[in-house]
Amino acid sequence: MMKRNIVLCLLVAGVLITGCSKKEEVQEPVPVEEDVPKEEAEAPEFVHTYPLTGVGTNDSIDQRAVAVMVNNHTKARPQSGLTKADIVYEMLAEGEVTRLLAVYQSEKPEQVGPIRSARDYYIELAKGLDCIYVCHGNSPDAESMLKQGYIDHLNGLYYDGTLFKRSSERKAPHNSYISFENIEKGAMEKGYNLTGAPASFVFLNKEEIKRLEGDSVTKVSINYGFPAYNTQFEYDVQQGKYKRYSNGEQTKEATTSVPVLVDNVLIIETAHRVIDKVGRRDIDLQSGGKGYLLQKGKVKEVEWINKDGRIVPVSNGVDVGLIPGKTWVNIIPNQPGLTKNVTLNAAGN
């Protein structure tokens, strides 16, 4: 009887233990993998960058640059096409009269002009950017270069009334114009390549622009020796660009009155030498020298060098980057030079 009771107790205890164990068993949840989206690299805003402006684009950038000799005589103003130029070079021709070399690659103006005659140093600048060079007439030195095929070119002397058109509103030699359509037409007729972009300049990124150093300067005046050909630039804070003036008159498009606005103003000095009785010059674009670079309302002293035919601002031998946008380059005699012929004015002065 006692054995029976012991066995019964053991059976009851076993049942109780088994029951408790079943209650204590907790089934752990099976982890479910969540679909976490992978972070993708941010796509660039544009796929290309224009080599002469540093401006982004999704269009082709392979078009060849075109350099046009633009008349800057008082009787030739206001001009056509300057607002579309990527780069404009301004320097003396004869006497105290300046002339402009307008370079186009990212934009094509409907019409450019008035067109003026070639000079050898402008040809050198155009050659450095592998441009098709457009002029109407030439100096003896320039004529020699053109006839020898030094640069692909269109000369209005041979296309007056065909590719080049005369405006009835002005008198010669201040009335020769050419459309961009006719530039391309003439280039194709002569078998010139219309593709082949120039090498790119160095441009600053957004962070580098924020860290720009230099003295605050809102206005600059450049003296070429005669008031009618003196040039001024004024920084427009709201637009973040420079407005250009000739003897106090703002530079605008002839037909639309759209003002010329630029992002970089580079002023350099170099040796000038008068070579004939007419007052033509030899201008040294090889040796380098001193300069001022104006960007975003600030100015800094730089040096310039000729790098593969291009005028490039440097500091301690390193390229000084340009603000993406348009650039105007003023080249002045080094006698008396920057300190005498360039006036820098700070805000409020």
Where are each of the predicted segments found?
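Positively charged n-region of N-terminal signal peptides that target proteins for export
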Residues: M1-I6
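C-terminal motif of bacterial Sec signal peptides marking the signal peptidase cleavage site
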Residues: L16-G19
